[in-house]
UniProtKB/Swiss-Prot annotation:
Its EC number is 1.1.1.261. The keyword Cell inner membrane does not apply. The lineage of its organism: Archaea, Thermoproteota, Thermoprotei, Thermofilales, Thermofilaceae. Catalyzes the NAD(P)H-dependent reduction of dihydroxyacetonephosphate (DHAP or glycerone phosphate) to glycerol 1-phosphate (G1P). The G1P thus generated is used as the glycerophosphate backbone of phospholipids in the cellular membranes of Archaea. This is Glycerol-1-phosphate dehydrogenase [NAD(P)+]. Keywords: Cytoplasm, Lipid biosynthesis, Lipid metabolism, Metal-binding, NAD, NADP, Oxidoreductase, Phospholipid biosynthesis, Phospholipid metabolism, Zinc. GO terms for cellular component: cytoplasm.
Length: 347
């Protein structure tokens, strides 16, 4: 087993102030900061103060797609950058991560919300020209800076989405172990333990997280870090992405007009997948409810019919063995699962 992990991790109030120190440790005096205008309006002055005396260029993006990746790459070449920083939520982080990877530069992750585990992982989520999702394995961040003073002020919905994404590791790990037993698939045990621990941290501390204190948000950030590193150790998203993610991706494909977030969908998918695994799905449902995350199709803004279709189509989306390959789902059983878990209302 070989793994590349972040060289520096700071999760505390004021972590943004460590950005110049991290860049110096990377031997870097010129950088590109990828962000969006909303994030910059909130924390831009802090970043400007931290980077005073260093050469940098700010690239504002609106979408995580190849055109914005190319803009970030062009900026990196123009200023002769020796690192690329992603400041913000999922989109700026993904664009910066992929631009850094394509340019052969270290990536510094500076999340302003913990809406999923992507801020610490080697995985990039982009959209192709047709709007279809792309998942690309790159390199993990060289450094991760989570400023709790900033992240704890993020919209509650984004943080609740992060809880949904992390508790989904309960079922992604179960799916990986199922694949090990039934197909002989190899997944490093340490990666599975890391992902398992991430989920357990959030479930054990959900009351503190639901209070949205810096300590609670810090637990969520640490769990996200652990999940991201689990993927780096495994060399794939396998420990952290199973049937619950397939359900989410299926919703993205078959209900593209919905407004739900990735982690919200994964959380509901984890309720369903826990039921299929024979787990106590109420533990996940109750944790999601405590932080205000959706637990029903109504909460996701989709219909029961949408969810049934997504569930039945989920296993077709990628070649990854999960509980969906074991349980012989049909429309009637899918409705039964959704109704018994309360994800869909009873008829």
């Amino acid at each position: 087993m070989r793994a590349e992990l972040p060289k520096r991790v700071v999760v505390e109030r004021g972590a943004l102030q460590f950005l110049p120190e991290v860049l110096r440790e990377l031997g870097c005096s010129k950088t590109v900061v990828v962000t969006d205008s909303g994030v910059w309006s909130v924390v831009g002055s802090v970043v400007e103060g931290a980077l005073r005396g260093l050469a940098y260029e700010v690239v504002y993006i609106e979408a995580a797609d190849n055109s914005n990746v190319e803009r970030a790459r062009s900026a990196a070449r123009r200023v002769e950058a020796c690192a690329v920083a992603g400041l913000g939520g999922g989109r700026p982080v993904d664009v910066a991560k992929y631009a850094a990877f394509m340019e052969g530069l270290p990536f510094v992750s500076v999340p302003t919300a913990i809406s999923h585990d992507g801020f610490a992982s080697p995985i990039v989520a982009l959209k192709d020209p047709e709007g279809n999702p792309l998942s690309i394995f790159t390199r993990p961040p060289a450094a991760v800076l989570v400023d709790l003073a900033v992240v704890s002020r993020a919209p509650r919905r984004l943080l609740a989405s992060g809880v949904g994404d992390i508790v989904g590791k309960v079922t992604s790990v179960a799916d990986a172990r199922l694949a090990q037993r039934l197909t002989g698939e190899e997944v490093p045990e340490v990666a599975l333990r890391m992902a398992e621990t991430a989920a357990r941290m959030v479930l054990d501390e959900v009351d503190e997280i639901a209070s949205w204190t810096e300590r609670g948000v810090g637990v969520l950030a640490q769990a996200g870090l652990l999940a991201g590193m689990a993927m780096a150790v495994a060399g794939s998203s396998r420990p952290c992405s199973g049937s619950e993610h397939l359900f989410s991706h299926s919703l993205d494909k078959y209900v593209p007009w919905k407004k739900s977030l990735h982690g919200e969908q994964v959380g509901v998918g984890a309720i369903i997948a826990s039921y299929l695994h024979g787990f106590n799905w109420r533990v996940i449902r109750d944790a999601l409810a405590k932080v205000g995350a959706p637990t029903t199709v109504e909460g996701l803004g989709v219909t029961g019919e949408d969810a049934v279709r997504a569930l039945l189509k989920a296993r077709e989306l990628r070649k990854r063995f999960t509980i969906l390959d074991v349980v012989e789902l049909n429309e009637g059983l899918a409705w039964k699962v959704l109704r018994e878990t309360g994800v869909a209302p009873t008829a």
